[in-house]
Amino acid sequence: MTNTDTRDVEATLAQIDRLVRRGCEAVRVAVPDMAAAKALRALRDGSPVPLIADIHFDYRLALAALEAGLEGLRINPGNIGPREHVDRVVDAAKANDAVIRVGVNSGSVEKHLLQKYGGPCVEAMVESALSHVRMLEDRGFYDTKISLKSSSVLDTIAAYRLLAKSCDYPLHIGVTEAGGL
């Protein structure tokens, strides 16, 4: 993932180039606002590898990323919004042959799951991921991968083990806040 200001097309493309030279085959870029979303077309046109939009809070940013031609999205069930927003994103992803990564973080698990389990835990993360994947499947969308992250490495491992028993989707294993190049 880039750590540049996505709105700075020149700096972001330079970082993408450095990542590609080090072997990256796809690069994720943050899309925190519409100004960043407006830069995505230029990034897509200038990138030699597929780009994935990291989306939080505003489903319209996901729609803008898909309209700009990005190949994938990372969405967080804990903050993407209600079902009707997810449905719009899924329909746009299908229309654009894009992949969706359902990325669950223990720190942003949905409130009803926090209440059910008494706080963030392995089971809450897995239930969040699986219920969100079902929303995608309900719309006939299966180009999905899943990630689970906790500040506890042991909880992250346990969550992936539990998730792997429950589905056959590809699992995206990453390190949060790993730093830049």
Named regions from a protein language model:
Residues 33-55, 88-100, 131, 160-171:
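Alpha-helix-loop-beta-strand connector modules within alpha/beta enzyme cores
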